[in-house]
C-alpha cells in the first residue's frame, strides 16, 4: 500500500512465512525489507559488533535512542501450535530484535499466541517506511539506460 504526500510516499508491506526454524522471523523480516526496498525505501546497515560490544551498545543505545532515525518500522505477529515450546518463540523474538538493531529498523511490537489451527509456526511481519516520491514517467524525460520499462506479463504486476 502507498500513501503519497507532496514530497514523499509512505509504503507498507505485509509478509507471512511458515516453518519451524528459529530463523523464520528473520526470513519474514528480510522479505518485508526487500519488498519495501523494491518500492524505494532506503535502509542503513550498522557495522557488525561482537557480543561484548553488543552488551555495552545496549546500555548506550538506551541513552542515544534518538540519535539515529529508524529506516522503517515493523510489527510482528507469531502464531504457533500448542506443541511448540515457548523457548523457540523467545529465540525467534531474540533473532528478530538483533536483525532489527543491525538494520536500524524500529520494532514496534511482537505479539505471540497459541493457535490450534496452525501446524507450523506462522510469522507475519508488517513493515512501513518512507520513500522519496516517484516522478511520473514520460517519453520526454526518459533517457537511454536510465529507465526500465516492463512489458508483457512482468509489466502487469
Predicted features by range, described:
Residues 1-42, 49-64, 105, 130-135, ...:
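N-terminal glycine-rich phosphate/pyrophosphate-binding loops that anchor nucleotide-derived ligands
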Residues 42-59, 70-157:
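Glycine-rich anion-binding loops of enzyme active sites
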Amino acid at each position: 500500500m502507498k500513501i503519497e504526500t507532496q514530497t514523499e510516499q509512505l509504503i507498507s508491506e505485509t509478509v507471512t512465512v511458515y516453518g519451524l526454524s528459529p530463523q523464520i522471523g528473520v526470513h519474514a523480516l528480510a522479505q518485508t525489507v526487500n519488498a519495501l526496498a523494491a518500492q524505494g525505501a532506503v535502509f542503513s546497515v550498522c557495522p557488525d559488533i561482537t557480543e561484548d560490544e553488543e552488551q555495552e551498545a545496549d546500555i548506550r543505545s538506551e541513552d542515544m535512542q534518538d540519535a539515529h532515525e529508524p529506516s522503517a518500522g515493523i510489527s510482528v505477529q507469531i502464531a504457533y501450535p500448542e506443541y511448540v515450546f515457548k523457548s523457540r518463540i523467545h529465540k525467534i523474538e531474540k533473532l528478530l530484535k538483533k536483525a532489527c538493531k543491525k538494520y536500524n529498523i524500529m520494532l514496534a511490537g511482537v505479539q505471540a499466541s497459541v493457535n490450534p489451527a496452525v501446524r507450523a509456526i506462522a510469522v507475519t511481519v508488517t513493515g512501513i517506511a518512507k520513500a522519496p516520491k516517484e516522478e511520473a514517467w514520460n517519453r520526454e524525460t526518459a533517457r537511454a539506460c536510465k529507465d526500465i520499462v516492463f512489458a508483457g506479463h512482468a509489466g502487469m504486476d
